[in-house]
From Swiss-Prot:
Annotated active site: 273
Lineage: Eukaryota, Viridiplantae, Streptophyta, Embryophyta, Tracheophyta
Coiled-coil boundaries: none
Protein name: UDP-glucose 6-dehydrogenase 1
Encoding gene per record: UGD1
Protein family per UniProt: Belongs to the UDP-glucose/GDP-mannose dehydrogenase family.
A GO MF term: UDP-glucose 6-dehydrogenase activity
Organism: Oryza sativa subsp. japonica (Rice)
Catalyzed reactions: UDP-alpha-D-glucose + 2 NAD(+) + H2O = UDP-alpha-D-glucuronate + 2 NADH + 3 H(+)
Binding site for NAD(+): 8-13, 33, 38, 86-90, 127-128, 162, 273-276, 343
Phosphoserine, modified sites: 394
Keywords, in A-Z order: NAD, Oxidoreductase, Phosphoprotein
GO terms for biological process, alphabetical: glycosaminoglycan biosynthetic process; UDP-glucuronate biosynthetic process
């Protein structure tokens, strides 16, 4: 029986291994993590991450050929193929701080693999890593491994979207495998390919050299984020000219050379990948003497920050240029619907901006806990040309935040409602009921364009929708960028 071990039981490692176990019942799959609490959650009925369809896949495979364990060294030592899906955050200090990927966890994983391996291993990069990381990992493994034990490094980046991860894994657009162009490297690529061909058509499995695979993941995320920043830049121009960004995006998306995906204007992109990977790409360009290319990609982040700042400014300016002492309901805190992931969510920066103007913020999200909200708002992060309101908040300021159990409670007695995540339930709320319980004039600031603005105006709301023509009230109170 082929044995697979995955280091890291997070948003990538857990779902990916669960689907491999589902589709390869004769392969033993073990997910390991140094966090005993996380492993306990994977072994319970309350999984540590929310992902549609994940519960069912885990339930069908767990205890059969899918296992979760904190006995890391044992299972790594027994495995034929070791996936490494550990965190690669942006460095917070030192050389490359604010841009470069921090490979501390990756290096620790490589040293541990070298120490415990008594047989040949195929080591698979699943985390998103900088170009040439495989070369560094090879050196660590070769210099620290036992005599006679061989290692082959593969790059097999994930192309998952949170909220649709199981669907993406079951029917991927493509599976990318990069390896050394040697006999041993090609054999390792084939071994991993044999796993995926159990359910993925062979024509969708792409093989490249290591460096192309590593860079392809960064490039894919950069291109997707670029599209979001492009349509968000257009949303600002639409508001200034009276155009409708939804109509513009639809017209542009009908061009077969462009396509319609990732053209929804919003308060900004978030998640664990886009900003981190673009900053990493910027750093790689700078290190390779390509400042013009670095500056090009840096603008994607700058537009994203601008969009969040613009949203906050619109809220404040619309409400008589102050939100001090006013209750603002925030509907949605996760970075997108159908996930509880709050990493780099635009809601953090919007909330900080409102609280910085002394607003009282009441937050509701169906999948985000109060503890998570408080942790996110208190967390420090590296300042990289960010506006002041994106800085860490003081404990005193965080006391201005409350978390509600539903949207109606969050909006009760509020002056304004900010919709920051496109949860389906926010489309069908009883907005007449919400309006009745709010201070007047009552505002809705739709950061995801999920509500019917005209229907809300008929109820009595003053409505701001990103990239849509402004009503008279908003025109009279222009937001300062």
């Amino acid at each position: 029986m082929v044995k697979i071990c995955c280091l890291g039981a997070g948003y990538v490692g857990g779902p990916t291994m669960a689907v491999i176990a589902l589709k390869c019942p004769d392969v033993e799959v073990v997910v390991v993590d140094i966090s005993a609490a996380r492993i306990d959650a994977w072994n319970s009925d309350a999984l540590p991450i929310y992902e549609p369809g994940l519960d069912d896949v885990v339930r069908r495979c767990r205890g059969r050929n899918l296992f979760f364990s904190s006995d890391v060294e044992r299972h790594v030592g027994e495995a034929d193929i070791v996936f490494v899906s550990v965190n690669t955050p942006t460095k917070a200090r030192g050389l490359g701080a604010g841009k470069a990927a921090d490979l501390t966890y990756w290096e620790s994983a490589a040293r541990m693999i070298a120490a415990v391996a008594t047989s040949d291993k195929v080591v698979v990069e699943k985390s998103t890593v900088p170009v040439k990381t495989a070369e560094a990992i090879e050196k660590i493994l070769d210099h620290n491994g036992r005599d006679g034990v061989g290692f082959q490094i593969l790059s097999n980046p994930e192309f998952l979207a949170e909220g649709t991860a199981i669907r993406d894994l079951l029917a991927p657009d493509r599976v990318l495998i990069g390896g050394r162009e040697t006999a041993a490297g090609r054999a390792a690529v084939q071994a991993l390919k044999d796993v995926y061909t159990r359910w993925v058509p062979e024509e969708r499995i792409l093989t490249t050299n290591l460096w192309s695979a590593e860079l392809s993941k960064l490039a894919a995320n950069a291109f997707l984020a670029q599209r979001i920043s492009s349509v968000n830049a257009m949303s600002a121009l639409c508001e200034a000219t009276g155009a409708d960004v939804a109509e513009v995006a639809y017209a542009v998306g009908k061009d077969s050379r462009i396509g319609a995906k990732f053209l929804n204007a919003s308060v900004g992109f978030g998640g664990s990948c886009f900003q981190k990977d673009i900053l990493n790409l910027v750093y790689i360009c700078e290190c390779n003497g390509l400042p013009e290319v670095a500056n090009y990609w840096k603008q994607v982040i700058k537009i994203n920050d601008y969009q969040k700042s613009r949203f906050v400014n619109r809220v404040v300016s619309s409400m008589f240029n102050t939100v001090a002492g006013k209750k603002i309901a925030v509907l949605g805190f996760a970075f997108k619907k159908d996930t509880g992931d709050t990493r780099e969510t635009p809601a953090i920066d919007v909330c900080k901006g409102l609280i910085g103007d002394k607003a009282k913020v009441s937050i509701y999200d169906p999948q985000v806990t109060e503890d998570q909200v408080q942790r996110d708002l208190a967390m420090s992060k590296f300042d990289w040309d960010h506006p002041v309101h994106l800085q860490p908040m003081s404990p005193t300021a965080i006391k201005q935040v409350s978390v509600a159990w539903d949207a109606y409670e969050a909006a009760r007695a509020a002056h304004g409602v900010c919709i920051l995540t496109e949860w389906d339930e926010f489309r069908s709320l009883d907005y007449a009921r919400i309006y009745g319980g709010m201070q007047k004039p009552a505002f809705v600031f739709d950061g995801r364009n999920v509500v019917d603005a005209e229907k809300l105006r008929e109820i009595g709301f003053i409505v701001y929708s990103i990239g849509k023509p402004l009503d008279a009230w908003l025109k009279d109170m222009p937001a300062v960028a």
